[in-house]
Amino acid sequence: MSEKLVEIKDLEISFGEGSKKFVAVKNANFFINKGETFSLVGESGSGKTTIGRAIIGLNDTSNGDIIFDGQKINGKKSREQAAELIRRIQMIFQDPAASLNERATVDYIISEGLYNHRLFKDEEERKEKVQNIIREVGLLAEHLTRYPHEFSGGQRQRIGIARALVMQPDFVIADEPISALDVSVRAQVLNLLKKFQKELGLTYLFIAHDLSVVRFISDRIAVIYKGVIVEVAETEELFNNPIHPYTQALLSAVPIPDPILERKKVLKVYDPSQHDYETDKPSMVEIRPGHYVWANQAELARYQKGLN
């Protein structure tokens, strides 16, 4: 049986108070096993990045628990616990240009975490760590003296990956790491992430809006709509047997690399008003082994009938 590294239980994240309160994430429940890539997919504003930022501690939570390696990590933490979590949980940001300090050299950008947490014995060891990781991401040691603006988007994202991985984390949150990149370099970055996962045993939370991309890298996928996770399943199970109407709509929008089939494809439009949750309240239900869907009892009966 796989060992859980991250567990999200009844998570709620809100902003503002009183009449201005906005609930961005509601009743989120999922877990991520050690060594797997778990993808969180949804359109812009769905709350997927909000969850990722809450796990790393950049967003506060209103309710529920975030469990990492058996310990609750949301809420108050000691300085020692916070420092340990920063080392063990790293984030690769969406926009490599905005997430890198333009006034710092690549050497300093990658070394900043090492300096803050004293993860080296002497200057020689620090240089060795930085040079090793910059080579691992496909750049050269001579690039360390340059500044971020001297690199392409793909190269800047490689620097962001190096900055995260030099800390030797256990868990990496990749927040749409290829959406700001040119199509020609997206596959290179995805292959790089897969390479590091295989070599270092990393666990990923991969946040994206494109289902065709996450199919390539994911073990399991969660689909989120307006702060509610509506479906969770293994990758091929989700693609072959999408149950929730929103998941079906997302999948229908994935391009097919065959012009004849693409012309015949019927796009589905998700209508949230089709759900009647006034009296029959929904919950996350396991409809098939390892396949969960957000549904009430009436919907569950209908979904199960459609599977038979």
Curated annotation (Swiss-Prot):
PROSITE patterns: ABC_TRANSPORTER_1, ABC_TRANSPORTER_2. GO terms for cellular component: plasma membrane. It comes from the Bacteria. Transmembrane segments: none annotated. One of its GO terms (molecular function) is ATP binding. It is a peripheral membrane protein. It is found in: Cell membrane. GO terms for biological process: peptide transport; protein transport; transmembrane transport. Keywords: ATP-binding, Cell membrane, Membrane, Nucleotide-binding, Peptide transport, Protein transport, Transport. It holds the Pfam family oligo_HPY. The keyword Membrane applies. Residues 6-251 form the ABC transporter domain. CDD domains: ABC_NikE_OppD_transporters (cd03257). ATP binds at G42, E43, S44, G45, S46, G47, K48, T49. Belongs to the ABC transporter superfamily. PANTHER family: D,D-DIPEPTIDE TRANSPORT ATP-BINDING PROTEIN DDPF-RELATED, TRANSPORT ATP-BINDING PROTEIN. Part of the binding-protein-dependent transport system for oligopeptides. Probably responsible for energy coupling to the transport system. This is Oligopeptide transport ATP-binding protein AmiF. It comes from Streptococcus pneumoniae serotype 4 (strain ATCC BAA-334 / TIGR4). The gene is amiF.
